[in-house]
Amino acid sequence: MDARIVFLLIYMCLLANNHAQITISNTNPYNSSNHLINNVLLGGGVSANNVTYQGDPIQVGFFNAINSNLGIDSGIVLSTGDIIDLDPNFFGFGNIPSSTNSDPDLLNIANSVPPLINQPFNVTGIFDVATLEFDFIPNSDTLSFKYVFGSNEYLTWINSEYNDVFGFFISGPGITGPYSSPPGFPNGSINIANVPNSIPPLPITISSVNNLLNSQYYIDNQSTFPQTISCNGFTTSFTATTVVQCGEIYHIRLALADGSDANLDSWVFLEAGSFSSNGSVSVSSGIANND
């Protein structure tokens, strides 16, 4: 065998070992939203109940990305398509989700971005919505968790109507916001998925974080070889944080959708064990089974 071919094979093996490919699962127990929240997402100092998921089952699951370039080792993934499409070893096309094509809060967020970045586009609709939501009680005065946003809309469709969008909507004591909130939380909700230190807050979409704007937070995955994850681009890991009142009940809705059409998927990756409030964890045993 040609020495150059041997060298190339060795080099590719070394790359593969240094950058392990992502693995995805939505089979038991990762097909349970209760398991994903209580056994994957929750960290210290929070208890959770009333867990619900809305969307196609193919749009949510568990990921393991240890030694990949994602920036998060493992956790929950939400997708606007079939999560299997993230696997570089999967050849073909995943199933098309049969999920809701409406979410006023996400549409409002998507269309709040253009004037904030001096762009003229307008998002005409919302498609392939996936949401995880639950009530929680924090054990301190701060809530935080880590996440990454990725999309195959990068970079072709930045600053266009195909502005895929997500939001982390939190409601509860001390919070008054413009977005919807469930019964029992009458003062609306706020979105805590924003570009760090942006004033006014700039929601994270493909048009607000990319190679041209806030580029310090953008990773171009198309130039990566070998790819550890089938995604054109993604953000660096962010920390969502907000002030809360210790011992009070709050509600959070984690939502993701395609903008203007159902083509080209986007994802939100939530780091395992990062949803925390600086205390010892006490998970409720009375969580409703709303899978």
Predicted regions and their residues:
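Bacterial Sec-dependent N-terminal signal peptides
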Residues: 1-25
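Aromatic (Trp/Tyr/Phe) and Gly/Pro-enriched flexible surface segments
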Residues: 21-291
